[in-house]
């Protein structure tokens, strides 16, 4: 068995199946488990996905939000057990895979148009 096949076999059991389809430009609500002292609690981080990176077990995504007038970005592993769930709030229409230009934008220029979804 090749090394690549062995890695895929080991990580296949750790991949999550409850991840919704989302991409850059979508607004998501991430329910992340955080540890404060001895207790764990769920912290909700809601913002725009500015990038997705990688594939398989090492895939990540970065979410950006504005908190008290300051831009906050947080990168989450896609298949992390520390993320309880991911909710897609709205689907954005963008023409780029990486939305780094949103870092310089504020106010109305940072808005993203909603993608139309046919049912």
UniProtKB/Swiss-Prot annotation:
Belongs to the bacterial ribosomal protein bL19 family. The keyword Ribosomal protein applies. GO terms for cellular component: cytosolic large ribosomal subunit. GO terms for molecular function: structural constituent of ribosome. The keyword Ribosomal protein applies. This is Large ribosomal subunit protein bL19. Keywords: Ribonucleoprotein, Ribosomal protein. This protein is located at the 30S-50S ribosomal subunit interface and may play a role in the structure and function of the aminoacyl-tRNA binding site. It holds the Pfam family Ribosomal_L19. SUPFAM superfamilies: Translation proteins SH3-like domain (SSF50104). It comes from the Bacteria. GO terms for biological process: translation. PANTHER family: LARGE RIBOSOMAL SUBUNIT PROTEIN BL19M (PTHR15680:SF9), RIBOSOMAL PROTEIN L19 (PTHR15680). The gene is rplS. Coiled coil: none annotated.
């Amino acid at each position: 068995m090749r090394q690549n096949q062995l890695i895929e076999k080991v990580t296949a059991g750790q991949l999550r199946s409850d991840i919704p389809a989302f991409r850059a430009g979508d607004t998501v609500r991430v329910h992340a488990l955080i540890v404060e002292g001895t207790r764990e609690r769920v912290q909700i981080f809601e913002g725009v996905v500015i990038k997705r990176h990688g594939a398989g077990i090492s895939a990540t995504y970065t979410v950006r939000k504005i908190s008290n007038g300051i831009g906050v970005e947080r990168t989450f592993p896609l298949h992390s057990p520390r993320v309880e769930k991911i909710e897609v709030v709205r689907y954005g229409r963008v023409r780029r895979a990486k939305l780094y230009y949103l870092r310089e934008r504020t106010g109305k220029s940072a808005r993203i148009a909603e993608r139309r979804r046919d049912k």
